[in-house]
Structures are given as structure tokens and as C-alpha cells.
């Protein structure tokens, strides 16, 4: 019998890739989306998925029957000057409603896409941390398995252009005159979207073999490089003429200077990162070059 998975954030970068992978592995895919969301990332699979409006959570479970797993990837970063209350509504209130409805409908597992950022860095990271605590609360009472997936820095083609990696790649491809940057000493664990998807598929394969009510997995390569090295590598691979001005921007208050995944738990399930940094980055650049 086909496993049935509900995805939030299906129109986003991570969610759309997940949906395509799930269909390729013969999962039945259901999804919640905002009424105004662009469907451009899922046009090729629109007839193969079951789409519901984000306001129809309760009716979704009544109409579609048993859902085995919820994969929650929808989020609000606050990049578009949203009010703090709007960020908290998107990152706490909405997934909490989903937890409650899913629990009532007998959903067995909730996979939560989480951040590695310091919880006090900004409203986004604080809201994600507070929802994590609510997820633990649910799992402690054996209401639903809550698996927290802490994602390092994901990159790949067709990402949100406002994200740092996409902005740097597109700026270098377009040869803008100057790219203003911090000193770039902070280190990040950059992982290609294909490896993130393979991690999720690994977790789904093991979901019935682990009895943990709460468990946390870190998804990354396990290695970090500096922001400066990332930018300079993009600059070299694109043969860009853009002037890189490191140190022209200040660090954010509370900036994380070192971040990399501890992949021990994932590797114990048989997962391994397959893409090396420069090869995956060059693949991303070449795919983005076509879009310019």
C-alpha cells in the first residue's frame, strides 16, 4: 500500500524538490499551500499531487483519509519586512494547528524542518525554536512522533533569489559592478539540495523502524567553509568581472561564526552526502546560467 505524505511549503525550494522525489518513489503526495502562492516550481507535477488551501487543514484530513507522515517545510523568514506577529503566526500558530489536526487524525510522524541559527538572532529563529519546544511537548505525551530536522545551508538551482547563495551566484553571473560583503570569516556548512532530499528519503524509509517519540537529525555535509571561500569560488567558477568588496558590510548582531552539521545520527541510518562542494556548486552555476 502506498505511503501517504502531507507536505507544507510545496511551492518553495525545499518542498517542491521533496514532492518530486516522493512521487518518484511512489508516495501519494498531499500538500497545503497559500491561495496566493506561485505554482511555477510544481507545474510539472501539478496533476500528480493533491493540493489543499492552507486554511482547510481540518477539512483536508476529513476528505483525504489516513495520512502517514507530515513533512513541514513552510516557513516565514521575515525577509520581506513582515511584522513579528506575522512571523510567529506562520512559524508557530500554523504548524501548531497542523500538529493538533494531524494528531486528531492519527498521523504517526511529523518531520519538522528546523534552523541551526541562534534562537535570539531574529524573530524567525526564535519562532522556530519555540515551535520545536511545542513539538517536544507533543512527543513527550506520545501523541505523535516528532522528528526535528536541523538543516544547514541549502543551495541549488532555482532557489529564492533573495537567499545569500542565489544572490551571490546571480550577481557574479550578471557581472554586476560591485558585490558588497562582510569580511566573510563566518563559516557555514553548504549542502546541495539533492543531498538534503536524499536525507529526507532516508528518514522516511526508516520511519517505521525507529520508535523514538522525539529525535533530532542534523543535515549537512559535516564540513564548513568560510563565506569568503564560498564567494570567491563562485566568482572563479563564473569567470565573473564583479568587484568583491569584503568588509564593506558589518556583521549582524549575534552573527553565528561557525556552523556545521553533526551527521552521526543520519549516517547510522545509512545516509551519506554524495556531492562534493565544488562539483555541486559548479552544477548549480551552470543550471542558473541557463536562466539568465
Question: Can you name each region flagged by the protein language model?
Answer:
Residues 123-125, 129, 133-188, 193-204, ...:
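NAD(P)-dependent short-chain dehydrogenase/reductase
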Amino acid at each position: 500500500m502506498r505511503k501517504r505524505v502531507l507536505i507544507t511549503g510545496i511551492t518553495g525550494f525545499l518542498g517542491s524538490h521533496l514532492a518530486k522525489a516522493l512521487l518518484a518513489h511512489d508516495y501519494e503526495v498531499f500538500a497545503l499551500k497559500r491561495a496566493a502562492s506561485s505554482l511555477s516550481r510544481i507545474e510539472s507535477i501539478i496533476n500528480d499531487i493533491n493540493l489543499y488551501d492552507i486554511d482547510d487543514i481540518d477539512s483536508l484530513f476529513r476528505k483525504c483519509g489516513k495520512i502517514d507522515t507530515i513533512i513541514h517545510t513552510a516557513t516565514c523568514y521575515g525577509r520581506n519586512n513582515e511584522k513579528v506577529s506575522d512571523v510567529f503566526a506562520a512559524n508557530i500558530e500554523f504548524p501548531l494547528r497542523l500538529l493538533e489536526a494531524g494528531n486528531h487524525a492519527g498521523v504517526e510522524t511529523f518531520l519538522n524542518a528546523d534552523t541551526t541559527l541562534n534562537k535570539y538572532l531574529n524573530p524567525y529563529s526564535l519562532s522556530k525554536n519555540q515551535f520545536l519546544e511545542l513539538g517536544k511537548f507533543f512527543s513527550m505525551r506520545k501523541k505523535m512522533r516528532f522528528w526535528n530536522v536541523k538543516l544547514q545551508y541549502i543551495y541549488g538551482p532555482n532557489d529564492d533569489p533573495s537567499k545569500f547563495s542565489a544572490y551571490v551566484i546571480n550577481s557574479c553571473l550578471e557581472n554586476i559592478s560591485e558585490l558588497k560583503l562582510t569580511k566573510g570569516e563566518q563559516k557555514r556548512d553548504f549542502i546541495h539540495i539533492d543531498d538534503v532530499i536524499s536525507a529526507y528519503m532516508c528518514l522516511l524509509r526508516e520511519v517505521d523502524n525507529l520508535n523514538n517519540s522525539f529525535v533530532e537529525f542534523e543535515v549537512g555535509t559535516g564540513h564548513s567553509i568560510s563565506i569568503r571561500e564560498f564567494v570567491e569560488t563562485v566568482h572563479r567558477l563564473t569567470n565573473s568581472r564583479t568587484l568583491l568588496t569584503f568588509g564593506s558590510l558589518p556583521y549582524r548582531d549575534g552573527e553565528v561564526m561557525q556552523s556545521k552539521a553533526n551527521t552521526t545520527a543520519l549516517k547510522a541510518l545509512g545516509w551519506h552526502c554524495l556531492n562534493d562542494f565544488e562539483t555541486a556548486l559548479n552544477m548549480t552555476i551552470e543550471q542558473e546560467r541557463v536562466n539568465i
